[in-house]
C-alpha cells in the first residue's frame, strides 16, 4: 500500500454486537417512567377532584358530610343508637363555693 492511497482508505471499525432479541433497556425505562407519571397524575386527580366529587354525591343522597364513614361502619339512620347512659354528675350542681366539699 503506498502512502497516498492510505489517506483515502477508511480505518476498520468493529461492528456492534448483534442484539439478543430481548426488550431493550431504554424501552423498559420509558415504560417505567410513563407508568410512574401516570400514577402521580391519577393520585393528584383523586386529591383535587374525585375525593370532593365522592363527598358531594354522598351528601346529595341524604347524608351530611360530617356523617360520612367509608367502609362497613356507615351510619344507619333507621336504627339510631339510644342514649341509655345515666348522667354521673348532677344536672345543676349549683355555684362553686371554695372550702366546701
Curated annotation (Swiss-Prot):
Keywords attached to this Swiss-Prot or TrEMBL record, sorted alphabetically, are: Host membrane, Membrane, Transmembrane, Transmembrane helix, Transport, Viral movement protein
Instruction: Give the species this sequence originates from.
Output: Maize streak virus genotype C (isolate Set)
| Keyword tRNA processing in record | no
Record-linked InterPro entries: Gemini_mov
Q: Where in the cell is it found?
A: Host membrane
**Where do the record's region annotations for Disordered lie?**
80-101
Q: What is the lineage of its organism?
A: Viruses, Monodnaviria, Shotokuvirae, Cressdnaviricota, Repensiviricetes
**Main location per the UniProt record:** host cell
Q: Where is the composition biased (Pro residues)?
A: 90-101
Q: What does this protein do?
A: Involved in the viral transport within, and between cells.
Q: Name one GO biological process term.
A: transport of virus in host, cell to cell
**Which protein is depicted?**
Movement protein
Q: Which domain of life is it from?
A: Viruses
- Cellular component terms per the entry's GO annotation: host cell membrane; membrane
